[in-house]
């Protein structure tokens, strides 16, 4: 909007029409030649009386015939001017004119606006009147026979409420609900419409109402109607940006204004009405749904209400734009578009008296249903709240209250408002002094009903409880006509001011929220062509870094919002601005961000959730007021045209037949508006010719851009102009292609980013996804599956189409199971391992997984159950397999779905399942991490090394399983049983197993290879390697051990058996380390000093990285401390280096023996080491060291010496004492007796280096798992 003219489409610059206020004037109504044609596409019930049916309307005339760059779409305009076709009335019916607007969005995303006034005109064709009477005779014959045949009758008849014997009532009913050609006057709807490039709704409404008033007035208009229509089509220009314009209707001037280049874009729909209709709370919720690109269905009897809410909410999206299907008024013939499996914003007209519960919608799992008339909304499940919602609503409330609008909406005032309106109309009609006929007074009301003063009077009457009696309102209004005119202008100004202030509050939210977005835009391409070519493969926005920089309360909303198409397009526009002119919305937004930085310097790392109110409300309102108080441009007055005399004669109540020859073309070049722009037009023509030379490049760029910007939304808009079966089939093909492409993009994104995350865990890269992002992607996948299963449904049976399908599949399968003798497992048959003990095979069963979900009392809805089942299947790596099994029942699929449904397109379905199968390459915990309170059955198996020890022991063994979410407590293992099952609340990812026994009986020494624990719902199997003895007088004398778990990869039974046996060099971390040092044959496995120091650095570095992740994304700290490459293992290597082994002392010596000798030395000597300045510190360190060691030794646990050393390291790390203890150990005289001179602990430089490394983790708060330090009192 930077230029003086709109830019509605390619080549617009070559035509003067591009700068015109209106492009077409249209007349729609009944074609007398065609007669009455039922509107079959509207799906009307022929049981209704003929007056209640709808009939086909036609475009009777439109001027001009065509504009080259904006061709007239006759079918679409006709459909939207009269969305339900023609309607008929008699003199007893209400015939108030109705105004509504509409929008046509072309496939390239450009928009055209239509403004329609529909009124009723007397039918003069005897042929049509006779046809209507014939229809009534046929209807009455069928209707009354059915009334007397049964006690019920059709819905639109009132006869069911009458007593059959009440003859008088029945006759009244017949009189009301019939048409008699000799007695009744028949009226039919007719529409006049303006098609414009920009949404100047208020101006167009005023112009059309004045035209209607001219038709119904007793006096003919000052000039023929052609003069006014010709004037607005050809002589009224678009106001330039930042300017106001005045042009003339039939009776009064009309004004409009257009925001400047630095202001928010044009919005002429009164937000006041949208807030009054929905209420503030509801509107913010619907606004959030639109931001998250859900399916939004608006529902109202009034077409204009649908447009007002739709346009109002999309206007508030600045700087973003709705990218998907947008049909605020869905014609009755296009109801099949509600089946569209894509995000949409549509408006559906409700029939009078229709209950919401009777409205069958194809899909509701991700639907936001907005019942405008009843002030009611239904939100999807798992709905995140808008950031700072409470403060945001409070700020909006203050603006609304300032303008006298109740934040809760004005639903409760609607009944009294309606009554007051009817009183005013009745008084106007009955007032004999005004000299006007009924229709003229109604049209006057149409001029006044938008008046804020009248509206406030009605609301005040309601609030104060004043009963509005009949009074001569028309007289008082007539006496104050001049004042009323001023009030109307003031009310219009206040609407404009309210609009801009509300929009500023919304825009300020985004400005604050995305003030630093540029810092996270990834611009890797050197030129536009390479960027466009690789658009799908490139990541344009650093989402993980952006989210980690946001306040915690914002994350649920932002993590989903930055995945939307509108945000992706916004970032695309930012990147494209390197090479071409910046998008107008983006330019305004960036300017606002620059302004914020001038007044409030901020850095990306200093984000807060403190709410900052908008500070530009007054300034924005003043700019509007200045434009409306002083007109910048005045258009040419309507004038007499060169018309044939005698044609288009005025006849009250009838819209005349216009002279097409004078309306077909614009004025000659002496028009000052045309001549003024001639130079500009020639310049644009030269630019156009130049652009043709680079047309191929532009075509390529446009092609790539269209593809890049349509990711996940293959179909942008339903085509309204052609409803042939072939076009509908083609549209459904586009839906299917779009769903498949969306599935491919989502699974690829999930796969690449998840694999990237796992590479980080393996030390192969930097993290580029967080758990929050992962959860967002999975929720998005659930939404996609629901849309796929909702596409082409025969009959909807629940809010979740997927769960409904699963239930019906389950019913059929269970019937077959009952018929069979026993169920057959889908997995391989169980085989015994060499050791004789193993986990039994977990049956792979779609039905069993459904039963798990059905047993979860925490989930209350079908949508919730479907999403839980998807998460469980994904975690088990069975999603593709389960869905394939579900769809393999072809008779059921054919019963549930129409032929064009996605699930019945064989090739696309197979590709879809293949894309889902690719997700098996990565591990998800999306079920375990979400449903944290459910009870889960676990199965554990203890695998001993039978060749070296007894499989059966006489002592009493016990086990305790711990996970990220809790532990089981100590559970006794039945004697002589190595396998047990138990149920407890979800433990999350398993981390440790404590295993031990009480050392009773003769056979009390147990050599445990490993412990296996499996989650019986998700199938996740954890292996806890041990490879150590449990028993007194053997190994390190431990009666209990803490085992660190590792998740097993999915494998067959035979592979699992091999994995269960601990290889010689892959036993528990402690075992592996001891073997490498104390084994006489393991010299080659000893790490050298450099490797040990490197191991320490890596272990500490992993802990530091752990704490730099967001809290919710951190893994297990226990593994980093006690795992195979953890801190304990690294320090053990340090302490074992140069340790004098069993060859000298003739027995196994442990690190803990050295620790105890150090303690004994400190407790028996008062000698303080070298530096007297540090006496107090060293005394304190010695005291704490001795205290900790003694506490571990006296703990009521039967832990071995290696286990005690592990506890000491963990406690020293937690309490930040390790850097103080290391120099004490290195300087103690005991070290010379137990360590060789080349040992690392005897090298001062190495010890100092070790201290510095350990000091780097002192800034972190380390919380130890309870199983590690249980029973140790320090």
From Swiss-Prot:
Belongs to the RAB6IP1 family. Its main location: membrane. This is DENN domain-containing protein 5B. Residues 772-932, 1118-1267 form the RUN domain. It is a single-pass membrane protein. It comes from Homo sapiens. InterPro entries: cDENN_dom, dDENN_dom, DEN5A/B, DENN_C, PLAT/LH2_dom, PLAT/LH2_dom_sf, PLAT_RAB6IP1, RUN1_DENND5B. Residues 936-1044 form the PLAT domain. Residues 401-581 form the dDENN domain. Guanine nucleotide exchange factor (GEF) which may activate RAB39A and/or RAB39B. Promotes the exchange of GDP to GTP, converting inactive GDP-bound Rab proteins into their active GTP-bound form. GO terms for molecular function: guanyl-nucleotide exchange factor activity; small GTPase binding. GO terms for cellular component: cytosol; membrane.
């Amino acid at each position: 909007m930077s230029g003086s003219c709109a830019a509605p489409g390619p080549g617009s610059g070559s035509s003067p029409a591009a700068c015109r206020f209106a492009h077409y004037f249209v007349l729609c109504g009944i074609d007398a030649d065609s007669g009455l044609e039922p509107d079959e596409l509207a799906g009307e019930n022929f049981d209704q009386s003929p007056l209640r049916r709808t009939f086909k309307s036609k475009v009777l005339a439109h001027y001009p015939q065509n504009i080259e760059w904006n061709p007239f779409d006759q079918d679409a305009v006709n459909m939207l001017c009269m969305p339900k076709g023609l309607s008929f009335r008699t003199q007893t019916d209400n015939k108030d004119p109705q105004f509504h607007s509409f929008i046509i969005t072309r496939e390239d995303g450009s928009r055209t606006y239509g403004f329609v006034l529909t009124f009723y005109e007397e039918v003069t064709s005897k042929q049509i009147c006779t046809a209507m009477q014939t229809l009534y005779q046929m209807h009455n014959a069928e209707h009354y026979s059915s009334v007397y045949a049964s006690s019920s009758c059709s819905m639109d008849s009132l006869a069911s409420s009458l007593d059959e014997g009440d003859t008088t009532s029945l006759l009244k009913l017949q009189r009301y609900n019939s048409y008699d050609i000799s007695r009744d006057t028949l009226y039919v709807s007719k529409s006049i419409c303006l098609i414009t490039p920009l949404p100047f709704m208020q101006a167009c409404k005023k112009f059309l109402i004045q035209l209607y008033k001219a038709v119904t007035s007793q006096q003919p208009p000052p000039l023929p109607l052609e003069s006014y229509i010709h004037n607005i089509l050809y002589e009224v220009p678009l106001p330039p940006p930042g300017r106001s314009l005045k042009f003339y209707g039939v009776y009064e001037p009309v004004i409009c204004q257009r925001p400047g280049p630095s202001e928010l874009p044009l919005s002429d729909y009164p937000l006041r009405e949208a807030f009054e209709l929905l209420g503030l709370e509801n509107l913010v919720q619907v606004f959030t749904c639109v931001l998250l690109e859900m399916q939004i269905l608006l529902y109202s009897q009034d077409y204009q209400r649908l447009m007002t809410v739709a346009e109002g909410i999309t206007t508030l999206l600045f700087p973003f734009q709705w990218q998907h299907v947008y049909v605020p008024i869905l014609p009755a013939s296009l109801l099949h578009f509600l089946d569209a499996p894509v995000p949409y914003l549509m408006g559906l007209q409700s029939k009078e008296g229709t209950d919401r519960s009777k409205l069958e919608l194809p899909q509701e799992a991700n639907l936001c249903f907005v019942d405008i008339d009843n002030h009611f909304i239904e939100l999807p499940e798992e709905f995140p709240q808008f950031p700072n919602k409470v403060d945001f609503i409070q700020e909006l409330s203050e603006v609304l209250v300032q303008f006298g609008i109740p934040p809760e909406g004005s639903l409760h005032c609607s009944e009294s408002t309606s009554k007051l309106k009817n009183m005013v109309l009745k008084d106007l009609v009955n007032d004999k002094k005004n000299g006007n006929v009924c229709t003229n007074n109604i049209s006057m009301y149409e001029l006044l009903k938008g008046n804020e003063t009248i509206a406030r009077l009605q609301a005040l009457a309601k609030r104060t409880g004043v009963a509005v009696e009949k009074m001569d309102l028309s007289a008082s209004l007539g006496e104050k006509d001049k004042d009323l005119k001023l009030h109307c202008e003031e009310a219009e100004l206040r609407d404009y001011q309210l609009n801009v202030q509300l929009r500023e509050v919304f825009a300020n939210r985004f400005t604050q929220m995305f003030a630093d977005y540029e810092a996270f835009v990834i611009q890797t391409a050197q030129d536009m062509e390479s960027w466009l070519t690789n658009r799908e493969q490139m990541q344009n926005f650093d989402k993980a870094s952006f989210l980690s920089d946001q306040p915690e309360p914002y994350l649920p909303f932002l993590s989903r919002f930055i995945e939307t198409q509108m945000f992706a397009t916004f970032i695309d526009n930012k990147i494209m601005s390197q090479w071409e002119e910046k998008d107008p919305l983006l330019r305004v937004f960036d300017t606002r961000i620059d302004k914020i930085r001038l007044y409030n310097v901020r850095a990306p790392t200093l984000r807060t959730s403190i709410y900052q109110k908008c500070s530009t409300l007054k300034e924005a309102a003043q700019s509007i007021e200045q434009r409306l108080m002083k007109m910048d441009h005045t258009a040419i007055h309507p004038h007499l045209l060169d018309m044939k005399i005698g044609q288009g004669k005025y006849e009250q109540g009838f819209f005349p037949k216009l002279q097409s020859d004078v309306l077909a073309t614009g004025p000659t070049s002496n028009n000052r508006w045309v001549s003024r722009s001639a130079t500009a037009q020639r310049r644009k023509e030269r630019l156009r010719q130049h652009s043709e030379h680079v047309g191929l490049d532009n075509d390529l760029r446009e092609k790539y851009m269209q593809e890049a910007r349509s990711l996940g939304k293959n179909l942008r808009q339903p085509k309204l102009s052609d409803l042939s079966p072939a076009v509908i089939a083609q549209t459904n093909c586009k839906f299917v292609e779009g769903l498949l492409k969306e599935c491919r993009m989502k699974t690829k994104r999930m796969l690449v980013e998840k694999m990237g995350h796992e590479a980080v865990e393996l030390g192969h890269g930097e993290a580029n996804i967080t758990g929050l992002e992962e959860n967002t992607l999975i929720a998005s996948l659930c939404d996609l599956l629901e849309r796929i299963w909702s596409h082409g449904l025969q009959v909807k049976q629940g809010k979740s189409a997927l769960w409904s399908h699963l239930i019906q599949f389950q019913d059929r399968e269970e019937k077959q199971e009952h018929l069979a003798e026993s169920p057959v497992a889908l997995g391989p048959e169980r085989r015994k391992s060499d050791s004789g003990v193993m986990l039994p095979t977990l049956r792979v069963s779609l039905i069993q997984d459904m039963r798990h979900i059905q047993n979860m009392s925490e989930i209350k809805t079908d949508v919730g159950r479907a999403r839980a089942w998807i998460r469980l299947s994904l975690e088990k790596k069975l999603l593709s397999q389960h869905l394939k099994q579900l769809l393999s029942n072809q008779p059921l699929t054919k019963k549930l779905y129409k032929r064009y449904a996605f699930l019945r397109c064989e090739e696309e379905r197979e590709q879809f399942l293949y894309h889902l199968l690719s997700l098996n390459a990565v591990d998800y915990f999306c079920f375990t991490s979400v449903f944290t309170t459910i009870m889960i059955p676990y199965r554990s198996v203890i695998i001993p090394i039978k060749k070296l020890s007894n499989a059966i022991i006489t002592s009493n063994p016990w086990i305790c399983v711990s996970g990220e979410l809790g532990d089981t407590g100590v559970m006794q293992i039945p004697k002589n049983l190595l396998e047990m099952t138990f149920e407890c609340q979800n433990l999350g990812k398993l981390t440790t197993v404590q295993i031990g026994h009480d050392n009773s009986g003769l056979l009390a020494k147990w050599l445990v290879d490993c412990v296996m624990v499996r989650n019986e719902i998700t199938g996740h199997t954890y292996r806890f390697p041990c490879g150590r003895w449990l028993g007194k007088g053997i190994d390190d004398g431990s009666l209990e051990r803490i085992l660190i778990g590792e998740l097993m990869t999915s494998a067959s039974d035979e592979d699992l058996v091999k994995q269960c046996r601990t290889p010689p060099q892959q036993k528990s971390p402690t075992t592996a380390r001891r073997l490498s040092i104390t084994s006489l044959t393991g010299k080659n496995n000893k790490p050298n000093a450099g490797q040990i120091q490197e191991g320490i650095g890596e272990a500490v570095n992993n802990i530091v990285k752990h704490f730099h992740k967001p809290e919710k994304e951190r893994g297990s700290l226990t593994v980093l401390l006690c795992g195979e490459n953890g801190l304990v293992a690294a320090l053990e290597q340090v302490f074992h280096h140069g340790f004098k082994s069993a060859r000298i002392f003739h027995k196994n010596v442990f690190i803990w023996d050295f620790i105890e000798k150090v303690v004994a030395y400190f407790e028996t000597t008062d000698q303080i080491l070298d530096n007297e300045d540090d006496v107090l510190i060293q005394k304190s360190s010695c005291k704490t060291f001795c205290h900790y060691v003694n506490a571990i030794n006296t703990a009521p646990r039967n832990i071995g010496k290696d286990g005690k050393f592990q506890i000491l390291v963990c406690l020293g790390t937690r309490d930040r004492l390790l850097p103080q203890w290391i120099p004490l150990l290195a300087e103690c005289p005991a070290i010379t007796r137990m360590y060789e001179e080349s040992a690392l602990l005897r090298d001062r430089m190495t010890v100092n280096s070790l201290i510095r490394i350990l000091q780097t983790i002192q800034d972190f708060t380390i919380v130890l798992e309870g199983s590690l330090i249980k029973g140790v009192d320090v």
